[in-house]
Amino acid sequence: MSIALQVALVMVTILVVLLVIGAPIGVAIGMSSAVSMICMIPADVSFATSAQRIFAGSNSFSLIAIPFFILAGNIMNNGGIATRLVNCAKVISGRMPGALAQSNVVANMLFGAISGSGAAAAAAMGGTIGPLEEKEGYDKNYSTAVNVASAPVGMLIPPSNTMIVYSSVAGSVSIAALFMAGYIPGILWGGAVMILAGIMAKKRGYQAEQRVPVKVALKTFWQAIPSLLLIVIVIGGILGGIFTATEGSAIAVVYATVLSLIYKAFKIKDIPRIVLEAAKTTGIITFMIGLSSIMSWAMAFTGIPDMIANAILGLTTNKYLILLLINVLLLVVGTFMDVTPAILIFTPILLPICKSFGMDPIHFGILLCFNLSIGTITPPVGTILFTGCRVGGTTIESVIKTLLPYFAIILIALLLVTYIPMLSMFLSKVLGLV
């Protein structure tokens, strides 16, 4: 057995053991990387290299967008914007079976698109629509399952922090192209959940809402326009070359703050608390990005990506089977690992394999984000699943049975995105971004 392989086994073993015993993901990544580096190079050199990699990994202009988008999401979550989006969603989906559940899906797509956070969408929509569903006699497990199943769509529909992280790791991948590539897969996911929610609503006897008068509908849309304009301003500005994704994220913060103050949903004195919440989340993400840069360097030094690539290509050279294997791997990884560290660790491993048979890095990025987003609604570390159940006032054990059919239809959507590249690439190509 070669020294590189021995070091690779040490790294993987330490990482797995630390994760199993419940160590924080950042600590597990850092410890396993540090030990493996000391095994390869002198301790003083490994410490110096680690410091350099941490700085280099987090010293990226595009990553500055992450704290701003997180802050914008927190401001909107506290600023009355969610209520207006829910009212708009109720008008859009009011005539469908299980109208309140359908409006939950639409609202998650709208709020997630603005905030970029699936967990924030699940909390905001569950807290707003959940009580209305309970009042109308909806089963808690049904309403929670719909909320949980649709919340991750916000990680695919731009602006998306996960896509920004992927872009920084993959290198030379346009954030604007990734943003556009996420629209159709995100809408496909949301549409699939709506279809199944409607079928289940009919079986349960949940009726459509009464027809809303045109005047009321127009008033509701008018009230939601300022909130929806945020998407138009940010995405339109990025696509039009007016500003970068990073600059757009700062504009999103200013716009969301001004809008929330106009709505009088919070006061100036609330801003420090909201900023502190965003700073905590940003600190965790940046910490993991820096430590994951050490792991990426150590893996490249030991040749782990080549080993995995050779192992997969040794099983088959059929690209369709390879994509299926990658999907299975990412679904398993997403079940046990949060989205950001999974992107940081597995992008350097899997992207070269996909490039070897001609897969576009943008298509792979969407595939990666789609797979790992599914992990956010699966135990044991599904953040959106935990958030949705807590807000919905139910338990994971009771929701899982109702959630299983949604897993099935989301997996069908995943296969469509996997094997029909144009679902991801169409908008980016039409707009000349690739």
Which residues fall in each region the model found?
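Alpha-helical transmembrane segments of multi-pass membrane transport proteins
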Residues: 1-434
